């Protein structure tokens, strides 16, 4: 792939509770008093994945949309790194079928669902024989499991059993929370 220049991770999932919100029934999923904004609920998957892969960004910019009750329902977070830019796109009130993408100078990696990948593709620029598909396509080896929480549970149990308070995952989580806090602090209501 050569030098990575851009990453765009997206998780836009229409909430099953949104129709009830539109009918005037405000459930916990759309109650701003509970602090469960979309960035904290589903944007975290994009942001955490970017932090795990690329580290803490040097600059963060964000924009959010709100519902009538000031619930932050969707947004975009731009994250600046020394040689690349990343974006986290998230929504609880729309749906998207676009894959998440890591773009390098010689190709791209496409990830079907950032929250629970089931297919990861490498598409290279060089040697293109099929311009419609953007070049050579290779399916990368990946074996999803039925319950994607199994990895988290195994790691969590290991941390508890080994008193792993200072584990590397802690720093990823702290960096992710700092970014989310920045987004929430800069959130202005856009209806």
Predicted regions and their residues:
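Predominantly a Rossmann-like dinucleotide-binding segment in NAD(P)-dependent oxidoreductases
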Residues: 1-58, 190
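Short, glycine/charged-enriched secondary-structure capping and boundary segments
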Residues: 20-25, 75-76, 117, 124
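Short glycine/proline- and acidic residue-enriched helix-loop micro-motifs
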Residues: 29-34, 133-141
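A generic structural signal for residues located within well-ordered alpha-helices
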Residues: 42-45, 151, 172-175
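Contiguous beta-strand/loop segments that form the cofactor/metal-binding neighborhood of enzyme cores
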Residues: 44-118, 153-164
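Short polybasic amphipathic segments
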Residues: 100, 117-131
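Active-site loop of classical SDR/Rossmann-like NAD(P)-dependent oxidoreductases
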Residues: 140-154
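C-terminal helix-rich "cap/oligomerization" subdomain common to oxidoreductases
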Residues: 154-191
């Amino acid at each position: 792939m050569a030098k990575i220049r851009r990453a765009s991770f997206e998780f836009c999932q229409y909430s099953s509770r949104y129709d009830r919100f539109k009918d005037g029934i405000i459930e916990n999923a759309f109650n701003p008093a509970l602090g469960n904004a979309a960035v904290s609920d589903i944007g975290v998957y994009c942001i955490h994945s970017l932090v795990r892969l690329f580290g803490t960004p040097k600059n963060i910019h964000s924009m959010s949309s709100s519902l009538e009750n000031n619930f932050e329902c969707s947004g975009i977070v731009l994250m600046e790194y020394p040689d690349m830019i990343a974006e986290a796109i998230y929504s609880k009130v729309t749906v998207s079928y676009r894959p998440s993408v890591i773009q390098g100078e010689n190709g791209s990696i496409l990830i079907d669902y950032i929250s629970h990948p089931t297919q990861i593709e490498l598409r290279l620029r060089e040697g293109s024989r099929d311009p419609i598909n953007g070049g050579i396509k290779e399916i990368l080896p990946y074996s999803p499991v039925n319950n994607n929480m199994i990895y988290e549970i195994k790691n969590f149990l290991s941390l508890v059993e080994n008193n792993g308070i200072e584990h590397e995952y802690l720093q990823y989580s702290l960096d992710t929370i700092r970014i989310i806090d920045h987004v929430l602090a800069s959130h202005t209501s856009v209806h």
